[in-house]
Amino acid sequence: MTKILIIEDEEPIRRVLVRILIDENKNFQLTEADNGKEGMSFLKKEKFDLVLCDIKMPKMDGIEVLQKTKINNINIPFIMLTGHGNLETAVEAMKLGAYDFISKPPDLNRLLTAVRNALENKSLRTENNK
């Protein structure tokens, strides 16, 4: 079972992401967090295969979540989401190790392609490390 953490403060966007992912694959096990602090708490307790993370959130933003995962040696692909398609923020997220960067509301095909590619890339890296 593939475990995906969705960190998104806007509940309507979170619902859309959940629906898209469940429609794509019924075997996805989804966990939801409504801010970066809650998301970081999940990341410290559980293993996930992928994280979808908003950038602008209360309590802890997505960039800070990325920084903390790096500090804590949590090696999970992140797909960053933002309602403000800012190139500087995208570059910063990628420098911190984000796998991809998607504007909100997410385009269905773009999101699913990014999810599939991130999971496939993670699977290949895991195979190569055996």
Where are these regions (language model features)?
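Two-component/phosphorelay signaling modules centered on CheY-like receiver
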Residues: 11-31, 45
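Helix N-cap/capping motif at the beta->alpha junctions
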Residues: 18, 32-41, 62
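Short amphipathic alpha-helix used as the core "switch/output" element in two-component signaling
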Residues: 22, 41, 63-75, 92
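Active-site beta3 strand of CheY-like receiver
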Residues: 46-52
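Active-site residues of response regulator receiver
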Residues: 54, 82
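Receiver (REC) domain active-site loop signature in two-component systems and cognate sites
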Residues: 57
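A Lys-centered signature of the CheY-like receiver
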Residues: 104
